[in-house]
């Protein structure tokens, strides 16, 4: 995982749209050189690689730091937004991940914390998240949102 550092982003959000915000996560995308490449969840051959794949993303949970503020108000109980070790397939376009040809990458695994919340009222909003994983990778991101 790359250390995200501190960043500010300006975003436009349509009215009446719920937001899914990654607080901190780590993703492993399998590529053609990986031993498990092309295996799907449920394939008996995947079991042998599952532990290794999980180890690539396990550093995220539990998070050392997890903070989210919306318009200055803290969101409590962020630990309940954890998602642990979800396997998935990802369709990538030509020239996508690592300059690859169009492909269906599998197996992939993700672990992290995500918050989803109701649409914000029209107008300007500030969303600020700070998170640090088990390896000390820290992200401090401010989103200045214009809704409507």
Predicted regions and their residues:
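Extended, well-structured beta-strand/loop surface patches
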Residues: 61-124, 130-148
């Amino acid at each position: 995982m790359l250390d995200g550092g501190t960043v500010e982003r300006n975003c436009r959000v349509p009215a009446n749209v719920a937001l899914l915000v990654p607080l901190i996560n780590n993703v492993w995308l399998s590529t053609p050189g990986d031993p498990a490449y092309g295996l799907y969840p449920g394939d008996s051959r995947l079991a042998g690689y599952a532990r290794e794949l999980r180890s690539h993303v396990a550093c995220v949970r539990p998070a050392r730091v997890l903070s989210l503020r919306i318009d200055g108000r803290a969101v409590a109980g962020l630990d309940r937004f954890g998602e642990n070790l979800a396997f998935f397939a990802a369709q990538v376009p030509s020239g996508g991940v690592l300059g690859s040809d169009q492909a269906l990458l599998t197996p992939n695994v993700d672990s992290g914390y995500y918050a989803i919340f109701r649409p914000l009222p029209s107008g300007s909003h500030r969303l600020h998240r700070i998170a640090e994983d088990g390896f000390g990778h820290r992200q401090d991101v401010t989103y200045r949102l214009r809704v409507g």
